[in-house]
Amino acid sequence: MVSPLLANLYLHYAFDLWAARWRRREATGDMIIVRYADDIVVGFEKEAEARRFWDAMRARLREFSLSLHPDKTRLIEFGRFAAVTRRQRGLGKPETFSFLGFTFICGKSWQGHFQLKRKTRPDRMRAKLQELKDELRWRMHQPIPEQGRWLKQVVTGFFAYHAVPANGAALSAFRYHVTCLWRRSLRRRSQKDASTWQRVGKLADDWLPKPKILHPWPHQRFAVKYPRWEPYAGVPHVRIWCSEASCHSSGCKSRQHRSPVDAVVISSDVPIALEAWM
């Protein structure tokens, strides 16, 4: 096993520095590189460059005894113009991709303009709720205030990461399911327990935070953080983001790392994307 820290350092040299050099020397259109641990997203303005980078990346990784997982590597149409170009060719909606717990979707605003939306991945929410359910069984006989304080921490932590614009439905669903699990746990404490919906609803109002969007739209955050690097942050042609993603760029000669790497290559004007594992 290679520790996450060592794996991250390895990929910094094996991928990040090399990718940044490729962008400087080869890219003629916009190109954005995002990596968080072993998750990678690369955005392109031009489809041809996305395909050339994909080939070059495979060759680069082979030098370090790494390879892209064939089933988890995709080149997809995605971005501002993806829906229009696919509709002109008689195809369906643009494909989605997952990154750091979110599903990224080509959506529209209330005004009908393009809007990149992030939704909590259903499997991640189910896993979190199952974890909470198991913990509630252990805490079943704790005093209600103690349970309430713990559940408040759980819900607050979930919201702190997932409370992004356009994800309000997932926040409400998570809080609702937490309330249901709490009620079920209270009713199991005793056959005579009368934990009605009205009573548990009041407990939820007392202890569980209400759904609230906590993060700004990515273009607002990026425009402040990278005003020079990204002059068109307000009206992007290519935009890949994630609340916790950190951008790196890489090249190393060590051959110790063997863990899989996720990647997505996105092109917006000619919308294409690639998902990968090593």
Tell where the protein language model's regions lie, with residue ranges.
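Non-catalytic terminal/accessory segments
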Residues: 1-278
